[in-house]
């Protein structure tokens, strides 16, 4: 089997300038990445930014620790990948053998990582996630054990410290559980577009549960965007096959909206399949890319990463400040006020972030 490559974050320095956050160690994921680019790429970099499923994942992957053969154990045990059923079973088994390691010191090397975790069992392979521009460690990596029992031993130990820093090992298989995404953000929508027209268009993809039409709290007029929640996840997948949709007389930009809980899960563990993984897998089977979705872990405000999950700027020029905990979008209408009032039909209120 060929090695699956862990890509880098994309141009972290450029993203920092684009989003307008502080310099230094803040290299978080940039929400200004378009959904289309996100589906075709991996995780992006930017200061204090959220993610719309990532940015570029690839970059300079030849640096130390940028590659890992996620299928080594399968080959060592004499397995073949002759059928989709076997492929899925083998992938599920490998989930039991691998771990995500967060909170690493910037000085921790691949050798340090392997030496430490070898105390718990044979390490088949490991990697550190590196910034493709600077070559600097991004503070997390992955370990593949020979046996799942080694993972259990790691988890049984209450605290792990490497190079003087408490680290955070997690089971990689935890990434498999995720809530379905049923909500979208529609930008570039004319405030004059009737709700009936919006419902008619998007109802063609599946049953609409609710439509939120944000109002300007000063003018009491509708803003140039809305949120739509569907009964099921499938309509969202269909809609996201195109970045732009013509709704009434408006050419609208569509992005996936997520609850805070969904967003945090996506940032830490990523999505297997669905929107972000769609372009990365091979055929109908699960992707072999270990790093799929993990690369934005550092955006969780964890340890030295220091990136709070709120207050992200930039999402194609949308500003959700004050809109009932919807944030991370930037300013679509170039107005400074929050959104306050919302005209809503059915459903329940929640706090959402971009995907």
From Swiss-Prot:
Residue positions where N6-methyllysine is found in the record: 119
A Pfam family it matches: CBFNT
Biased composition (Low complexity): 11-20, 27-42
GO molecular function, one term: RNA binding
Keywords for this protein: Acetylation, Biological rhythms, Cytoplasm, DNA-binding, Isopeptide bond, Methylation, Nucleus, Phosphoprotein, Repeat, Ribonucleoprotein, RNA-binding, Transcription, Transcription regulation, Ubl conjugation
Modified residues (Phosphoserine): 71, 80, 82-83, 190, 271
Modified residues (N-acetylserine): 2
Keyword Phosphoprotein (UniProt): yes
Main localization of the protein described in the UniProt heading: nucleus
Domain of life: Eukaryota
Post-translational modification: Arg-345 is dimethylated, probably to asymmetric dimethylarginine. Methylated by PRMT1, in an insulin-dependent manner. The PRMT1-mediated methylation regulates tyrosine phosphorylation.
Compartments in which it is found: Nucleus; Cytoplasm
Modified residue annotations for Dimethylated arginine: 345
Chain positions found as Phosphothreonine: 91, 127, 193
Asymmetric dimethylarginine: modified positions: 345
PANTHER family listed in its UniProt record: HETEROGENEOUS NUCLEAR RIBONUCLEOPROTEIN D0, RNA-BINDING (RRM/RBD/RNP MOTIFS) FAMILY PROTEIN
Protein name in the entry: Heterogeneous nuclear ribonucleoprotein D0
Gene designation per UniProt: HNRNPD
